């Protein structure tokens, strides 16, 4: 079984002020991942949100200054700090886990390296039982 891993980004699970175009593109990528998973049974495709990673992409926010509104201060603080953000090792481990779990567990799903309990038997069991879990949709809206 082939594996494809995509990277999500900020604004996919919460509003991301001043970055709406970026967020909409990443949300589209999440949905595309789910649709390809549904249409391609011999492919394990999943998407991973790495969290804040110190990379050059953040220089654009710093360059924008006050136009980036509250994001400027937040990014500047993180870039100036000793906090390295999410490590490449953690991101790689999550990607390896998603590939190893295969389509039954990871296929079409959106994982957070930082906030999800990936790598645990409990989550793997839940994902096997709930095809809607960790996917982009209105979910459980029929409760009374």
Q: Whereabouts are the PLM-identified features?
A:
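Catalytic loop of short-chain dehydrogenase/reductase
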Residues: 1-41, 49-55, 59-65
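C-terminal helical subdomain
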Residues: 47, 67-144
